[in-house]
């Protein structure tokens, strides 16, 4: 059984967010004591805005933490390498992951924010691309294969050595697998996107 919010301890917090470096988190809490005003279960730090520089909290691998929300079980981390930079979203409840389609699929597209809002999403990202003939596409024609709540859309990308497309599948038991685009979609797949 789940603990009541008032019973959540620091150890409970770090059991879920094991990626967070405890010393840097404690330093942040020392500087921002209001963070614990509602206990460990009430932690909701968000310094991920475009005009914000993130927190002083680090992961155990040294990445900067941008946001952590205990209730939603989400962690945002700034990641960077020689040829990339971005934000890694760590969602601790895989049952909440889903692929959602534009309401105008086949006619027009929507922004990722509009799709997320329509489906009660907390975090969102684009999945499949869309066909854009002559740069005149409107986002309504799906590129590649996708599945949303067990309903398949589009056609699979052709897998070649030069273009090794893959498919991200979320299964009905809420596990995730990545498969080649030329492999059959698993029978227990509920959501998928190809890239």
Set out the residue ranges of the language-model regions:
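Zymogen propeptides
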Residues: 1-160, 167, 175-177
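A substrate-binding/cap region within the structured catalytic cores of diverse enzymes
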Residues: 155-195
């Amino acid at each position: 059984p789940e603990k009541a919010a008032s019973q959540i301890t620091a150890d409970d917090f770090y059991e879920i967010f094991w990626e967070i470096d405890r010393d840097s988190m404690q330093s942040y809490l020392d500087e921002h004591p209001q963070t614990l005003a509602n206990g460990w279960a009430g932690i909701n730090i968000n310094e991920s805005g475009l005009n914000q520089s993130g927190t002083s909290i680090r992961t155990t691998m040294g990445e900067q933490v941008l946001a952590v929300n205990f209730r939603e079980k989400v962690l945002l981390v700034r990641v960077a390498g020689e040829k990339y930079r971005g934000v890694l979203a760590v969602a601790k409840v895989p049952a909440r992951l889903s692929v959602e389609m534009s309401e105008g699929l086949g006619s027009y597209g929507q922004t990722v924010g509009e799709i997320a809002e329509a489906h009660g999403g907390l975090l969102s990202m684009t999945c499949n691309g869309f066909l854009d003939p002559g740069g005149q596409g409107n986002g309504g024609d799906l590129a590649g294969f996708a599945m949303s709540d067990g309903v398949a859309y589009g056609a699979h990308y052709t897998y070649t050595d030069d273009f090794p497309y893959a498919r991200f599948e979320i299964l009905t038991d809420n596990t995730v697998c990545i498969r080649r685009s030329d492999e059959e979609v698993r029978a227990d797949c509920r959501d998928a996107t190809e890239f």
